[in-house]
Curated annotation (Swiss-Prot):
It is an enzyme of class 2 (transferase). Pathway: Bacterial outer membrane biogenesis; lipopolysaccharide biosynthesis. One of its GO terms (molecular function) is hexosyltransferase activity. It comes from Escherichia coli (strain K12). Gene3D superfamilies: Spore Coat Polysaccharide Biosynthesis Protein SpsA, Chain A (3.90.550.10). It comes from the Bacteria. CDD domains: GT_2_like_c. PANTHER family: RHAMNOSYLTRANSFERASE WBBL (PTHR43179:SF7). Its EC number is 2.4.1.-. This is Rhamnosyltransferase WbbL. Rhamnosyltransferase involved in lipopolysaccharide biosynthesis. GO terms for biological process: lipopolysaccharide biosynthetic process; polysaccharide biosynthetic process.
Length: 264
């Protein structure tokens, strides 16, 4: 079973289209929509699907919201060790049949952690560079000061399944037991670097991330204002410092040192 988790920060229109594309009542997976804004419209949209779970209450960041949804799944459904969680952004476009084929492929390969090829347009001419190398301090400095991201992996030259360092949280398929084993997302972050941190801990725990280029989805990525005076920039800077500081102390023996609903 695959538990698909979608977090909404006011993304009613995107989620309506996504649920239509995925056939939200399909028996092969269970969709959980976590509403960060207690939207009546979103609740009404979700009520059209008998097999969908809608949960709300409280305003949190990316990682915290996803942890809440995973904890809900853990308590209500008691997933098997080999079940999966798919963290899916609301602005992803993927057809039902394509997702099922991808899931079956990953299961056949026994990949514990994987992602696919994301594009930013329906013509599939613009890549979303969602798989990257783990950043170091100099990478963040160059990115902030010059707008150049040296950690991007050139996906155009990858034609077969490849192990990569990390992938964006917009599309992550991870074995349920492995996610819980590393205590999920670190809730000490807010909106930035949660995905890098999670991928690092999974890597340290021996869980390899496979990039599967043969499967595609569309991601209408929205990039926040990164000017030095913006709130998004301050969040990003704070998360960067946290990642760089904690990278030095993390190991596969001390994941309990993160802030998570799985380890209060």
């Amino acid at each position: 079973m695959v538990y698909i988790i979608i977090v909404s920060h006011g993304h009613e229109d995107y989620i309506k289209k996504l649920l239509e594309n995925l056939n939200a009542d399909d028996e092969h997976y269970k969709i959980i929509v976590r509403d960060n804004k207690d939207s009546l419209l979103l609740k009404q949209i979700c009520q059209h699907y008998a097999g969908l779970d809608y949960i709300s209450g409280g305003v949190y960041g990316f990682g915290h919201n996803n942890n809440i949804a995973v904890a809900y799944v853990k308590e209500k459904y008691r997933p098997a060790d080999d079940d999966y969680i798919l963290f899916l952004n609301p602005d992803i476009i993927m057809k039902h049949d394509d997702l099922l084929t991808y899931i079956k492929y990953v299961e056949s390969k026994r990949y514990a952690f994987s992602t696919l090829c994301l594009f930013r347009d329906e013509a599939k001419s613009l890549h979303d560079y969602s798989v990257r190398k783990f950043p170091v301090l100099s990478d963040f400095i160059v990115s902030f000061m010059l707008g150049i991201n040296k950690t991007k992996i050139p996906k155009e030259s990858i034609y077969s399944d490849t192990v990569v360092d990390w992938c964006a949280g917009s599309f992550m398929l991870v074995r349920f037991s492995d996610f819980v084993r590393v205590n999920g997302f670190d809730q000490g972050y807010f909106m930035y670097c949660e995905d890098i941190d999670l991928c690092l801990r999974l890597s340290l725990a021996g869980v390899r991330l496979h990039y599967v280029p043969a499967f595609h989805a569309i991601h209408y990525a929205h990039h926040d204002n990164r000017s030095f005076f913006s709130k998004a920039f301050r969040w990003h800077l704070k998360s960067t410092f946290r990642y760089l500081a904690r990278k030095r102390i993390l190991s596969n023996r001390n994941f309990d040192r993160i802030s998570s609903v799985f380890h209060p």
